[in-house]
Amino acid sequence: MWIGVISLFPEMFNAITEYGVTGRAIRNGLIDFHLWNPRDFTHDKHRTVDDRPYGGGPGMLMMVQPLRDAIAAARKAAEVNGGKAKVIYLSPQGRKLDQQGVSELAQHDRLVFIAGRYEGIDERLIASDIDEEWSVGDYILSGGELPAMNVIDAVARLVPGVLGHKESAEQDSFSNGLLDCPHYTRPEVLTTPQGDEMSVPKVLLSGNHEHIRLWRQEQSLLRTWTRRPELLNNLALTAEQEKALTLIKKQVK
């Protein structure tokens, strides 16, 4: 996968280029990652990248010319590498990201993410140069860098070969629309600060893979129903899941 990012703070992306799953994917050549700074496309000695909005009001907007030139450079680089890129603007008014959206984005071979700053960008630029707007949630951030890293990390996990275990992405929370089941590691008995002992569920120690599968499915359904019940509204559960959920609802009141 080819990924480009346009940002006034490209250094922030060291968090994903140098560390973790995404860093390893870049080093292994599974993700081809590039950065563009609109400041590099300015024509004044101050490298100005902001401008006042028409109509007045607080705050500034990202200047059109440097940003538009950066987008053009990113698009051209993507085409040189084999095809047209989809340009994504991280924006509060965009489609809210969920796992379905991540899966859709992962179907594209080339993506360019624009990390906005200040009060945003000119609406005409959104109409003419942006393909899609995406939001990571209904809250305020100082810029689009963190949302861009959020999306890139989520998408990267679906790139073939990025995760060490082929089933890891399939078993993550939301991959099947449900929250993930609880997980446990050593020690088998954990002592709390209050002196209580908490043990690993016996089924996980049984070695019976079918019992473990059913337990994990039940726990996933239970956790989703008690913590995020709205997620169940749009899911097409299997007959086995429907039966398990019905039993859970009878047992937990």
Curated annotation (Swiss-Prot):
S-adenosyl-L-methionine binds at G116, V136, G137, D138, Y139, I140, L141. It catalyses: guanosine(37) in tRNA + S-adenosyl-L-methionine = N(1)-methylguanosine(37) in tRNA + S-adenosyl-L-homocysteine + H(+). Belongs to the RNA methyltransferase TrmD family. GO terms for biological process: tRNA N1-guanine methylation. Disulfide bonds: none annotated. It comes from Colwellia psychrerythraea (strain 34H / ATCC BAA-681). Its main location: cytoplasm. The keyword Iron does not apply. HAMAP family: TrmD. The gene is trmD. The keyword Cell division does not apply. GO terms for cellular component: cytosol. Specifically methylates guanosine-37 in various tRNAs. One of its GO terms (molecular function) is tRNA (guanine(37)-N1)-methyltransferase activity. This is tRNA (guanine-N(1)-)-methyltransferase. Homodimer. Its EC number is 2.1.1.228. Keywords: Cytoplasm, Methyltransferase, S-adenosyl-L-methionine, Transferase, tRNA processing. PANTHER family: TRNA (GUANINE-N(1)-)-METHYLTRANSFERASE. NCBIfam families: PRK00026.1, trmD. InterPro entries: Alpha/beta_knot_MTases, tRNA_m1G_MeTrfase_C_sf, tRNA_m1G_MeTrfase_TrmD, tRNA_m1G_MTases_N, tRNA_MeTrfase_TRMD/TRM10. It is found in: Cytoplasm. Pfam families: tRNA_m1G_MT.
